[in-house]
Amino acid sequence: MFRRLLIATLIGILAALAVAAFRHAMQLLEWIFLSNDTGSLVNAAEGLSPWRRLITPALGGLAAGLLLWGWQKMNQQRPHAPTDYMEALQTDGQFDVGASLVKSLASLLVVVSGSAIGREGAMILLAALAASSFARRFTPREEWKLWIASGAAAGMAGAYHAPLAGSLFIAEILFGTLMLASLGPVVVSAVVALLTTHVLNGSDSLLYTVHLTVDLHAREYVMIVSTGLVAGLCGPLLMWLMTASHNSFLRLKLSPPWQLALGGLIVGLLSLLTPTVWGNGYSVVQSFLLSPPLFSLIGGIFVCKILAVLASSGSGAPGGVFTPTLFVGLSIGMFLGRIWGFWLPGSDEIAILLGLAGMATLLAATTHAPIMSTLMICEMTGEYQLLPGLLIACVVASVLSRTLRHDSIYRQHAAEH
């Protein structure tokens, strides 16, 4: 047992370093190519001339597509090995190291150039890859899946400052590939990754800053659960739209470089309307939580952003769908909050409350992981008083979504990419 705890600690540190390396690479490329040192792609887009804002995502997609296409052509005769941690956990626990690194580099290119795709996909992949490389050298083969799972959970903890949610991400989404009795090392790796991330960042701040002062009574619980019902309907719709977008790109029969470039060009065109479509949506979520926008502004940004997400994901841009899903959920929740605000006092407080509820419930509706989704929002914001209401709403959203569509967004995304 002591040996496993020691290995879990080392994997947590390795995962945090992998996440930090990807984050610093992003910041370096943003500074070199976009003259941006704020860490916000939205700020970078606002500082660019219209024509640069238009073509930058397309150029990033083209570069990433060429990289992926070139690697595929060079390695056509090689036997296939997983380049995704979920696939590795479901097979023999081995990665194609070269292909995984190329996929992560391609993800870095599309993320830095403004595509509306999440960076957490590459971060978790690199963390799991680091764990796999360590495990293959120093642990017996029968433990490899455990350490890949620990690396993936630690990667999520480092990316989202949410170690418990990262651990439950493994337990809920990958249920059946890892026994619950093995979660001890997974939790240790996730917590160590978070602590290492805090040391590297020089602070232990929450991922999102929220000022929520509303008292929770029966009325608030009704609003939270009703948000879960709406999210349970919207989750399958979002996944259907992603599938439809992906199939539309496939029907064009473009080579990967041109397909990703087209997805980037669509993002660039949308960014001429609003630069908030750039990136994974993190900075927009934070600004909305600090100052909820008006009804019409939420709707306008929401439509543009979801079109950008569909273009990026549908074109095959390598990356995650986690943070974009959080943005969509926030927008749905705040939209409902503004509707409730027509009749109830404290419109901004209601918008923030239901925005957080929307983030949790849409995440639950798309991942079919209600406990993880609830803890994720609480850990990212520190608003643990919402836990009982969010848990009920997330279960409602997950059950309704699973009834309407069996696949989760991660199973769908893995199948398409």
UniProtKB/Swiss-Prot annotation:
It is a multi-pass membrane protein. Residues 1-4, 75-145, 196-221, 279-287, 337-348, 401-417 are cytoplasmic. Its main location: membrane. Keywords: Cell inner membrane, Cell membrane, Chloride, Chloride channel, Ion channel, Ion transport, Membrane, Transmembrane, Transmembrane helix, Transport, Voltage-gated channel. GO terms for biological process: response to acidic pH. Residues 26-53, 167-172, 243-257, 309-315, 372-379 are periplasmic. The chain crosses the membrane at residues 5-25, 54-74, 146-166, 173-195, 222-242, 258-278, 288-308, 316-336, 349-371, 380-400. GO terms for cellular component: chloride channel complex; plasma membrane. GO terms for molecular function: voltage-gated chloride channel activity. NCBIfam families: PRK01610.1. Belongs to the chloride channel (TC 2.A.49) family. ClcB subfamily. Probably acts as an electrical shunt for an outwardly-directed proton pump that is linked to amino acid decarboxylation, as part of the extreme acid resistance (XAR) response. This is Voltage-gated ClC-type chloride channel ClcB.
